[in-house]
Amino acid sequence: MSINLDKILAELDSISELDKNNQVMLQTVQGCTDPLYGTGSLLQDHNGTMEERVSLVKEIEKEFVVPMFRGLVYTNSILKDLGMYRSRVMIMKPKQCYSYHVDPTPRIHIPLITNPDCFCVIED
């Protein structure tokens, strides 16, 4: 499957919430209209063991399938076709780094605009 980044970028220009936030959700849970709900780590609740929290997150994330912005017709179709959930868009300022971390569940990262000197480390 090829992804048209220009179409995605054009649609993302319509999200006014990105003017004041560095990330917003593209998918949400039923009944939620807060574009920030779901950003950040879902592991912040420190009750139970890490294994229990990761198991809970794996279930919770699958509920994030409702399109947050109905006007993102092309972007929403890509998310649906790829079976993605809890998707979000992030904006990073120049000379800013994404912190080194381990995601507890599988992720797909699609850089829309980047610098040729940027890189991502992927290890098992």
Where do the language-model regions lie?
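Non-heme Fe(II)/2-oxoglutarate
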Residues: 1-75
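Sequence-level motif detector for i,i+2 pairs with an aromatic at +2
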Residues: 21, 84-87, 115
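Edge strands and adjacent loops of beta-rich recognition modules
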Residues: 75-90
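Short glycine/proline-enriched turns and hinge-like loops at secondary-structure junctions
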Residues: 101-104, 121-123
